[in-house]
């Protein structure tokens, strides 16, 4: 996925798809911005989730819809040696808890692009992600090849997943990732229409091939650089190697001066 936009922009209204009359903005490529702060240990309710309203509290202001992009965001600007770890296809109760435990142990945040068919029966893991300050992204319901399905089917895949996430954590996703990294115009338009930015990756661990923890670690080491987005998986097969590899490469990255972070919740 060469030539994709640089990561880092406002986190905008997630899955604002109930207003289907609104039209997406003009096509554009992404600009650079800083990543978010390092993780804070669990605060309840978490900053990711909607805060409870007091009796006279003001309602949350609607967030702006993102513009339609022609390419997915590929990386962030790398300020302060920032990197992003992302995990796709979950949550899976066999592997996601181990990943969450390692992230919590090192007090860092990551992004989880969840599939609705996995999330619907594992909402407790979504809440755990949110409570720990991780960002939850939309990875469709059944992980289809988006260019091969109709626009209406694509909308249903994305909207259903948005709803599951919002039901679980009180706020819909603001980020979307196409399965297999296969994007088309409909995917970009619907993602923006539903309030999400498209995020790809820079470093693919290929952990889904089950190459062994040592190989996964070696690929992360080789690809580590300021601004990169690392792709791994926490479901979709035996992901024990991914869990084991994270225990080794995460502290190595931190010891090397990398700041493992997530996109800023503020605009550029």
Positions of predicted regions on the chain:
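N-terminal pre-catalytic segment of deacetylase/amide-hydrolase enzymes
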Residues: 2-85, 92-105, 248-251, 256-268
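Short, surface-exposed connector motifs at secondary-structure boundaries
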Residues: 81-82, 106-111, 168-174
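Structural preference for beta-strand elements that scaffold enzyme active sites
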Residues: 84, 111, 135-137, 175, ...
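Active-site glycine-centered loops adjacent to acidic/histidine catalytic or metal-binding residues
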Residues: 88, 139, 179
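N-terminal carbohydrate-binding/catalytic regions of secreted carbohydrate-active enzymes
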Residues: 90-102, 109-117, 123
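Catalytic domains of cell-wall/extracellular-matrix polysaccharide-remodeling enzymes
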Residues: 98, 120, 144-259, 263-268
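Acidic (Asp/Glu)-rich catalytic clusters
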Residues: 99-105, 119-137, 192, 219-223
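Histidine-centered active-site/metal-ligand motif
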Residues: 134, 139, 143, 233
């Amino acid at each position: 996925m060469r030539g994709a936009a640089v990561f880092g922009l406002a986190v905008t209204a997630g899955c604002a798809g109930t207003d289907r009359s609104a039209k997406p903005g003009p096509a554009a490529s992404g600009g650079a911005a800083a990543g978010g702060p390092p993780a804070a240990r669990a605060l309840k309710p978490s900053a990711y989730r909607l805060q409870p309203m007091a009796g006279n509290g003001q309602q949350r202001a609607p967030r702006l819809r993102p513009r339609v992009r022609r390419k997915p965001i590929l990386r962030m600007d790398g300020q302060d040696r920032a990197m992003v770890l992302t995990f796709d296809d979950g949550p899976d109760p066999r592997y996601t808890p181990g990943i969450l435990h390692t992230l919590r142990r090192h007090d860092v945040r990551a992004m989880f692009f969840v599939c609705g068919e996995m999330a619907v029966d594992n909402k407790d893991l979504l809440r755990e992600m949110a409570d720990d300050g991780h960002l939850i992204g939309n990875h469709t319901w059944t992980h289809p090849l988006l260019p091969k399905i109709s626009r209406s089917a694509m909308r249903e895949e994305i909207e259903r997943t948005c709803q599951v996430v919002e039901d679980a954590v009180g706020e819909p996703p603001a980020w979307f990732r196409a399965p297999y990294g296969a994007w088309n115009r409909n995917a970009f338009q619907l993602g923006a229409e539903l309030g999400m930015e498209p995020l790809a990756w820079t470093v693919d661990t290929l952990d889904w091939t089950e190459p062994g923890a040592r190989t996964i670690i070696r690929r992360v080491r080789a690809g580590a650089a300021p601004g990169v987005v690392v792709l791994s998986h926490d479901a979709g097969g035996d992901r024990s190697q991914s869990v084991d590899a994270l225990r080794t490469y995460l502290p190595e990255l931190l010891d090397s001066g990398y700041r493992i972070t997530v996109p800023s919740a503020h605009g550029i």
